[in-house]
Curated annotation (Swiss-Prot):
Its EC number is 1.-.-.-. GO terms for molecular function: oxidoreductase activity. The gene is P33MONOX. It comes from Gallus gallus. Signal peptide: none annotated. Residues 152-165 have a biased composition (Low complexity). This is Putative monooxygenase p33MONOX.
Amino acid sequence: MSLPLGVPRRAFSYDDALEDTAPMTPPPADLCANVLWKQPVIPERKYQELAKIEEGDANMNAPVITPSSSTESVNKVPVVKAKATHIIMNSLITKQTQESIQRFEQQAGLRDAGYTPHKGLTAEETKYHRVAEAVHKLKMQSGETTKDDKQTSSAQSTPSSTPHSSPKHKNRGWFSQGSSASITAPDFVAMEAGGDRLPSERWSFFGPKAIQKSTNDPGGFTIQSYKGAQKPSPMELMRAQATRMTEDPVTFKPPKMDIPVTEGRKQSSHSHNIKPRDLNVLTPTGF
């Protein structure tokens, strides 16, 4: 390996330096960044002109100018190549994606048979323009099915005589489909008449869901979107458990807890002996 210019090779024995108490010799004074920068280390067979200049023992300025211009000319080519390959790869990936989407469309039956392309577009371009349309169709189909399911379930859970008492599930939006159709004339008059209501309540025919006061929390507001089988509140659950326990304390056996219960319970006789440490295994995870 050839040493860079400005760094002379010096025979240095570390064993002798260990035995010798004198300090190690400092590097030469001419070893600095300027020397290495003026004559850079260039691999062999890279630039033939530089090799000729070095062999011909030319002046110091020539090596400085030549590598910069040559490196610029060399560096330009790979950058352009990389950009070109990047663009080509992007277009290829886009084309493959579009083709796979079209294949899926054909399999799912989302494509219209009688589609006529725009006059200014070729048939090849219209294939790519129709991808967003097909995705929109797919979303619409899935949205309609969920809407129908929710309507049937709400109609089953709340049997009613009038069609408007069962709340319909609609997407949020200002002018959503069927929002104006669901408002009857007396409802609209009642909304207008109630002047002391909130503006969101008064103009609730723009949005599908009206804000009403909740029954459990008198201070807060809840969105009443579904009035089917409502979940019982925790207070109601506790009351139901207490009534069940007072009715038949023998059948109701809650897991053993540290909280003392005032009601007396009969200790059912077990054939097997359970130590108190084993009750941790037997208690359900909800407690």
